[in-house]
């Protein structure tokens, strides 16, 4: 999993992206990318960054769920083996946006419509995958609930 905040100027992002993905490309390691809050501060939009990443044959990044806030909202099923149809884990990727959360300045957050998509998709995957599977979520800015739990120690 590659995280965001590859802040850039004209041409810089593409050069750095090729540099940082070279190691996984040479080893044919699949990876996915989630956006950070600084990624679209220069000349590429969030969508253009994911589209660039998707040109790498080892990238599992996706624009499947474009109707929601952000560009890196998707799920990747992990199978028991290369020859298996049994899903053992779902990797969830959420775009936590940039500097506003529900209109409040500060850190971004995963928007309500993405959370609604997650609930709906998780329910459908539970049916399709014949039961609840473990999951692991990736996002650049953690939900405020994580910070509260950290502060109170529970």
Spans of features found by a protein language model:
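Extended active-site neighborhood of metal-dependent phosphoesterases/phosphodiesterases
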Residues: 12-132, 150
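Extended hydrophobic secondary-structure segments that form protein cores and membrane-embedded regions
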Residues: 2, 91-94, 134-140
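Active-site-proximal segments of metal-dependent phosphoesterases and phosphodiesterases across multiple
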Residues: 128-154
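Active-site neighborhood of phospho(di)ester-bond hydrolases with catalytic His/Asp-centered motifs
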Residues: 1-4, 30-37, 138-139
């Amino acid at each position: 999993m590659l995280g965001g905040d590859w802040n850039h100027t004209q041409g810089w992002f593409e050069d750095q992206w090729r540099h940082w993905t070279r190691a996984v490309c040479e080893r044919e390691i699949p990876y996915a990318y989630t956006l950070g809050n600084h990624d679209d501060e220069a000349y590429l939009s969030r969508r253009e960054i994911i589209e660039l990443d998707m040109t790498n044959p080892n990238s599992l990044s996706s624009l499947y769920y474009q109707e929601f806030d952000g560009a890196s909202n998707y799920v990747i099923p992990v199978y028991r083996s290369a020859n298996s149809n049994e899903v053992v884990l779902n990797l969830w990727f959420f775009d936590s946006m940039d500097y506003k959360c529900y209109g409040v300045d500060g850190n971004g957050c995963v928007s309500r419509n993405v959370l609604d998509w997650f609930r709906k998709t998780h329910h459908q995957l539970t049916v399709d995958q014949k039961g609840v599977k473990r999951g692991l979520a990736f996002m650049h800015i953690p939900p405020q609930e994580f910070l509260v739990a950290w502060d109170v120690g529970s």
